[in-house]
């Protein structure tokens, strides 16, 4: 089994990485950061997001597993004291692969049809560069839906619906549903300007095209990465064809994670 380990960079996570590497020498495991079969993230959800983007070019060939050295995360499901058990599981069993939907966004520029494509595991946001009111036309399936005015828009995946989307009042969506969700960020609603005022959940075959009005410099965030785009014509969002693959060695139910993170954990009862 070819593996690689990425850490948060703190002393606790780095020490755990070295412990795992030494333990893996007793097994038929080869450290290979160029072509791993399994990527082990040590830290938290932020570390796993970084690992996802580092290996987003080979998602069909790699599976991710997370070890959390801080707070309980939605992606990191193993604890530091369980690493030896995890290594044994990796070597002794055929692990189950769970696939989650991803978000695709294509930024189209006014420069001779030039465009760039990105994938997001959690969400992508769209705002102006300087924090002024974002004015955009929202088109769904090729039809004009609304003209949005506000701070911005957040487009999330089902697994990312528990993150920024939840703080915006969006719905929590089970990752088995191939969908994306559009949530408003401080929309302007009065007698003159109106938006739908509710999160929208779009299925896989629906495409959302957002076109800036009177400004062509847009700042997007793609998970933890912030990017400034100049001369933007439009940004297209849809459920990606690719999926992220997680290695599962034991049950890790989505709704239990939601309960433990936002209501109470088992050890608090």
From Swiss-Prot:
InterPro entries: ATP-NAD_kinase_N, ATP-NAD_kinase_PpnK-typ_C, NAD/diacylglycerol_kinase_sf, NADK. It catalyses: NAD(+) + ATP = ADP + NADP(+) + H(+). The active site is at residue 45. Signal peptide: none annotated. Keywords: ATP-binding, Cytoplasm, Kinase, NAD, NADP, Nucleotide-binding, Transferase. One of its GO terms (cellular component) is cytoplasm. It is found in: Cytoplasm. Its cofactor is a divalent metal cation. Its main location: cytoplasm. Belongs to the NAD kinase family. Involved in the regulation of the intracellular balance of NAD and NADP, and is a key enzyme in the biosynthesis of NADP. Catalyzes specifically the phosphorylation on 2'-hydroxyl of the adenosine moiety of NAD to yield NADP. NCBIfam families: PRK04885.1. This is NAD kinase. It comes from Staphylococcus epidermidis (strain ATCC 35984 / DSM 28319 / BCRC 17069 / CCUG 31568 / BM 3577 / RP62A).
């Amino acid at each position: 089994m070819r593996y690689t380990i990425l850490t948060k960079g703190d002393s606790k996570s780095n020490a755990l990485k070295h412990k795992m590497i030494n333990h893996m020498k007793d097994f038929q495991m080869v450290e290979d950061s160029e072509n791993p079969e399994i990527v082990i993230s040590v830290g938290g959800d932020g570390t796993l997001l970084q690992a996802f983007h580092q290996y987003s070019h080979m998602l069909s060939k790699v599976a991710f597993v997370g070890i959390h050295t801080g707070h309980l995360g939605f992606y990191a499901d193993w604890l530091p004291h369980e690493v030896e058990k995890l290594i044994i599981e990796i070597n002794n069993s055929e692990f189950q692969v769970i696939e989650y939907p991803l978000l695709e966004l294509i930024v189209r520029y006014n420069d001779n049809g030039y465009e760039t494509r990105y994938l997001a595991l959690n969400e992508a946001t769209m705002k102006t560069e300087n924090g002024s009111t974002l004015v955009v036309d929202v088109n769904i399936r090729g039809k004009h839906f609304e003209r949005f005015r506000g701070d911005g828009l957040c487009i999330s995946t089902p697994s990312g619906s528990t993150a920024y989307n939840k703080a915006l009042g969006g719905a929590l969506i089970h990752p088995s549903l191939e969908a994306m969700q559009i949530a408003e960020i401080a929309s302007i609603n009065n007698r003159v300007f109106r938006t739908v005022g509710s999160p929208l959940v779009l299925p896989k075959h629906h495409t959302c095209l957002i076109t800036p009005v009177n400004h062509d410099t847009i700042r997007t965030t793609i998970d933890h990465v912030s990017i400034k785009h100049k001369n933007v014509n439009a940004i297209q969002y849809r459920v990606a064809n690719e999926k992220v693959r997680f290695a599962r060695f034991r049950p890790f139910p989505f709704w239990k994670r939601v309960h433990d993170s936002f209501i109470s954990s088992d050890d608090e009862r």
